Amino acid sequence: MKTSLFKSLYFQVLTAIAIGILLGHFYPEIGEQMKPLGDGFVKLIKMIIAPVIFCTVVTGIAGMESMKAVGRTGAVALLYFEIVSTIALIIGLIIVNVVQPGAGMNVDPATLDAKAVAVYADQAKDQGIVAFIMDVIPASVIGAFASGNILQVLLFAVLFGFALHRLGSKGQLIFNVIESFSQVIFGIINMIMRLAPIGAFGAMAFTIGKYGVGTLVQLGQLIICFYITCILFVVLVLGSIAKATGFSIFKFIRYIREELLIVLGTSSSESALPRMLDKMEKLGCRKSVVGLVIPTGYSFNLDGTSIYLTMAAVFIAQATNSQMDIVHQITLLIVLLLSSKGAAGVTGSGFIVLAATLSAVGHLPVAGLALILGIDRFMSEARALTNLVGNGVATIVVAKWVKELDHKKLDDALNNRAPDGKTHELSS
């Protein structure tokens, strides 16, 4: 039985985004006041991210026959992340050099308002490699859950899963309790997702109301260039990877269409994380693979953010007439290979990493961030959408490599078929 169009989450979120854009454009003051609706929805999602990751990873690892399989999955995932994110960085670098959206602007860095980006520059000072690694280790277990730090929760969940697995039959009771708790958490997610249209409406109304459509026109060449690059990356790079793995990127995008709309409305790929964990498992990827790849990907496999970082850095160099020869660009690439891994899937994190990168490279003016401060919020949608698709594709690829992918389940889900061969409407 097909779900009514008006009852589908896809239609509701799309309608809410459209209404939010109209309200923000025609009544900007009212639109700005809608910010709490978007913030509230994202906070509700963040509230359950830590327990979702913990339950998924622990039950996935504890339920595996061999611990070697977990190590193999992690190694394959990290290798994939490094290769694909490097490709994303290089593509961004090539496109921005060909199009040169900042050429001819002739901006004097001394005339830019450095105070506007001072907060980001200060936060960027703590983005070093050692600081990043140390930040993965929580000061306390409770602190990891309280702060919602994905990597800290993931580290504890992996250790807990290993320890529970070693207990064998003695740990069965704990395993059953965590599985039951997981079902309760996903029940909460279903309730929260009913508020997705309200959250998307509030976030979009605020964005358009505060920054205005005029901001899109100003510096529009960079925005258009970035969006086209992200689309090309998804279609050509991720599309080729998907084809080699045995599925269609377009069918996969259709499968996660509701999650993409939620991300479009909130500009944060993190807002779709809980549902992605569930959907990737339903797609045929083993729970242990999903639990490791998706959360880790939110720090190590942000393809959209990688494209953004190279394009934004070179754009600032072009606009301020700063020297960017081949040596400088290779240096930039090497720095970004490290600094880009510190960007979480939340709004604004890419901007902080960009500030850290400009500081590390040295010869690029950090004050140049002021050039893109006004349009960064509009570029975050493309970043978040590309990040989400990239992590979804990564999960399927890794699951296939480690032989933990149910190909029939994948084919049935992407072709909208029930196990008996009958078509059905994807659940929302």
UniProtKB/Swiss-Prot annotation:
Q: Which PROSITE patterns does the entry mention?
A: NA_DICARBOXYL_SYMP_1, NA_DICARBOXYL_SYMP_2
Pfam families this protein is in? SDF
Assigned GO CC terms: plasma membrane
The membrane topology noted for this protein in its Swiss-Prot or TrEMBL record is: Multi-pass membrane protein
Q: Tell me the SUPFAM superfamilies matching this sequence.
A: Proton glutamate symport protein
Taxonomic superkingdom? Bacteria
Q: Which InterPro entries match?
A: C4_dicarb_transport (IPR023954), Na-dicarboxylate_symporter (IPR001991), Na-dicarboxylate_symporter_CS (IPR018107), Na:dicarbo_symporter_sf (IPR036458)
What sections of the protein cross the membrane?
Answer: 5-27, 47-64, 77-99, 141-163, 184-206, 219-241, 326-348, 352-374
Q: Where is the signal peptide?
A: none
Does the keyword section mention Transmembrane? yes
User: Which keywords does UniProt give here?
Assistant: Cell inner membrane, Cell membrane, Membrane, Symport, Transmembrane, Transmembrane helix, Transport
One Gene Ontology term of the biological-process aspect is: L-aspartate transmembrane transport
Biological role: Responsible for the aerobic transport of the dicarboxylates fumarate and malate and to a lesser extent succinate, from the periplasm across the inner membrane.
Similarity-based family: Belongs to the dicarboxylate/amino acid:cation symporter (DAACS) (TC 2.A.23) family.
This protein is called Aerobic C4-dicarboxylate transport protein
This protein's encoding gene: dctA
